[in-house]
Curated annotation (Swiss-Prot):
Gene Ontology terms: cellular component: plasma membrane
Domain of life: Bacteria
Record's protein name: Lipoprotein signal peptidase
Similarity remark: Belongs to the peptidase A8 family.
Organism of derivation: Aquifex aeolicus (strain VF5)
Transmembrane residue ranges: 9-29, 68-88, 98-118, 130-150
């Protein structure tokens, strides 16, 4: 059991660190390369914007004394919860999901700590209908959540095992 916990922890950490590094590298490249609109496909553009809020720009209008502590504390809590959940779940898919979420949280936390806002540069759209801009960290968090939902949707005993382990 202890060996498996160690493997789960390493899986989580390796994915979280990989996502974090990929996110920071792509954001730094975006700052250098995407100062103007770059159309990759008719539905995909790259250009840099700065987001003071969270997903979809939510909370960006809050005053800094409220917004900044909230947006700095939340990812730290997410990192702790995702690591512990991955560690004690006893499941590789959960560890991968939590690593994606944790790495994404860390990438956006880095931006908030050092820039006061998050760098977004990926823009998807169909015609004039745009999805809000995002980055690798945001995509990683979304994929991690989707993977976790799919896992529990298709394997109900997994949730029962997790509850039994915590008792």
């Amino acid at each position: 059991m202890e060996n498996f916990l160690r493997k789960t922890a390493w899986l989580y950490l390796s994915i979280a660190v990989s996502v974090f590094l990929l996110d920071i590298i792509t954001k730094n490249l975006a700052e250098k390369l995407f100062t103007t609109h770059v159309e990759v496909f008719p539905f995909l553009e790259f250009y840099l914007i700065y987001n003071k809020g969270v997903a979809f720009g939510l909370l960006s209008e809050l005053p800094d004394p409220l917004r900044l502590p909230l947006l700095l504390i939340t990812p730290v809590i997410a990192l702790i919860i995702t690591f512990l959940y991955a560690l004690y779940s006893g499941d590789r898919i959960v560890a991968i999901s939590m690593g994606l979420i944790g790495g994404g949280a860390l990438g956006n936390l880095y931006d908030r700590l050092f820039l006061g806002m998050v760098r977004d540069f990926i823009h998807l759209h169909i015609g004039e209908y745009y999805w809000p801009a995002f980055n690798i960290a945001d995509a990683s968090i979304s994929i991690g959540i989707a993977l976790l939902i799919l896992k529990y949707f298709f394997t109900k005993p997994a949730l029962k095992n997790l509850v039994n382990r915590t008792r």
